[in-house]
Amino acid sequence: MKFTQMLTAIDTHTAGEAARLIIGGIPKFPGKTMAEKRQYLETHKDGLRKSLMLEPRGHQDMFGAFICEPANEEADYGIIFMDSSGYLNMCGHNTIAAMTVAVECGWVDVPQGESQVKVVQDTPAGLIHGTVHLNPSGDVEFVSFENVPSFLYKKDISIFVPSLEKEVVCDISFGGNFFALVSAEQVDLDICPKNSEVLCKIGMEIRDGLNQNVRVQHPILQHIAGVDEVEFYGPAKSKEADFQNFVAFGDSQVDRSPCGTGTSAKIAFMHAKNLLNVGDSVICESVLETKFKGEIVKECKVGDYAAIIPRISGTASIVGFNTFLIDPKDPLKQGFLLK
């Protein structure tokens, strides 16, 4: 039996959300920036993503990333985020997973006796600086990273939702990707696992309606445009959290984690509404009630927009080491989705 490809991966999850990190067997991605590398991958090598994210190796809600050479020499590694429907410019839960693996698997040096390790990754949205916190045994306890500048982009936008037969009001906020923020109260649904399917359906309708009717363009990064994700938010279920969210994205995918970029977008929104100040922090819980911490590090500007630098903290776990083979005779070698 001959194979055209043998790909190695480290499977992880962050607060319940899958993060499959592809670390071997991939070709070199040309490009002077990570955005160019992502574009090359999308245009010329998208079969790799499909093979790794779709069935039978993955599933509709699969998420992962290619680990590659960084475009910026300051970074320890480059990372290109992907899911079952395509690519994202930034991902918080995958960042936490990659930085955990970088330390646990020896990608970065850990000086003996140190309780913190600095890690820098290069993404299509820019450089991400993180700190991996270690316990006394030297194992990773949690990861914090400073996200890209995040800001409220448009507020109080009404959009008609066909399945609800009414309009809802949302705010568009950037946290590495563009999010439509919608209070769950408007759709009369509690954020909980049993409502995931209907919340996701409504979320896709909101996202598609916004992208058809509202121009969304990052003021500096021209390759970032359009609403990628919809984040419903509501009261927290647990006493440790400040609010709960539910994030729908991709091809009707549901984030199991509190979503690092979504938490960034939410606290940027809260800062713009004078609900949070520099130095304040919140705990966001997911549909599974797993938690991320979001903090406002400082204020900044993105073009003409008032913005913040968020810090997101969370934990990830390694769940397996995989070797994937691609057989050229396999009629389903690039995967499929059955819904």
Labelled PLM ranges:
Residues 1-173, 180-339:
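A glycine-rich beta-to-alpha transition motif near the start of alpha/beta enzyme domains, typified by
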